[in-house]
Amino acid sequence: MRKLAFLLLFAAALSAACRAGAASLQAAIDAASASGGGVVRLPEGRFLSDGIRLRDNVTLEIPEGSILVASTNLAAYAEQTESYLAPEGRKNCKAFICAENATNVAVVGKGVVVGNGCFFTVRCSVGGRPRLLRFIDCRDVRVEGVTLLAPASWTCHFMRCDGVAVRGVKIEAHSNYNSDGIDIDAKNVIVEDCDIDVEDDAICFKSDTADFTVENCEVRNCRLSSNSNFIKIGTASVGVFRNIDVHDCEVSCKTPSGLTDWRYYADGIPGVRSARTGLAGIALEMVDGGVMENVSVRNIVIGEGVQTPVFIRLGRRHEPSVEGRPSAMRNILVENVRATAPAASLIACSITGVPGLRPQNVVLRNVELSFPGEGKPPFPGGREVSALFGDVPEASREYPENRMFATILPAWGFYVRHVDGLAFENVRLHLANPDRRGDAVAADDVSGLTVRDCNFTPHIR
């Protein structure tokens, strides 16, 4: 509440002169680009601005002591081309700072950008809530050093861009729903040394264009906090994800959600005892007819407040897909992942396909995870342990999420089903308390299962 009150007072205190400066800021950007490029540097102070469009070869510098605040008038934001087709139809959304078909653009500095997200209607359609930064069809994009606060929707979105660098950025986003941290639908990307604390997904790779490949992307040395998923690929997955490496990151939930308390979501998520939790530490989700291949997530430390450390799903959310092809997932490596606290729910990790769609060549290596146990009846929400594998629904077309099966899974560590080529290598699974499910790992319809140097024996159907 203190943060919300501060934003309200902040907006009320801004002068009309600041609004007049918005036109001057856009004019300076336009003039710099027309003259071949340059740096447009804000002075120190607080500035309320309408939507800003970056142009070729322009760097917007927001120095320390400068605070740029987004207008709450959505009509003052530039329209962006409605140029892509997702399975559910065309999408469009405005952004406070945007660029489209631009080359060599940047937002840098030690200053602050405030999205005023709490002023936009909570839970209204995403089209009615602007993103904070959005780049479409751009080349050579940099976002460095800035602090991004209180977006109304996604914080930083790169769509069909080539050559993206995000370095040393701090993001805090708890003012509205769908407040992702960094959404990557781009190629040749580096994200490093960022601190992200958000309501929705912290780092999320998306593919909303069937003929564009999200590839050659690296995320490293970041600290991620989320009330949703922490490291995610999907759910939007109509194109190709290839050669993605996420490594040397820390994930934990630091901030209790003021919007979604998972203890009371639906009839309650089993075992969740705090408002300070997120869903999956690592979530890999292919459900829209795209392809995911050559993905590694490694050197990850999982701290407190993570409900499910690993969630991997291949499904049929949208079928037929945009291109009429089924989803595929292959060559996945999860390596050197260590939990420093037990999982924050009774929902086990899962690696699942559906009949006819099977993840291929998935390796978990040097993984040590801890689970809470306490799997004694009755479970929250009246749920019971599935007595038979067949009791776990396929949920082929359901939205992929750790809780999607609406049941306590038959194992307390990992439930795996419909997979070709799955290796557990030096995997250690621990219980903080006894669990009546008994088995650490349950495998159903898994071919090519190998278990080496692990502290469990899978229950195999």
Residue map of PLM features:
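Bacterial N-terminal signal peptides
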Residues: 5-15
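Extracellular/periplasmic carbohydrate-active domains that bind, remodel
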Residues: 17-461
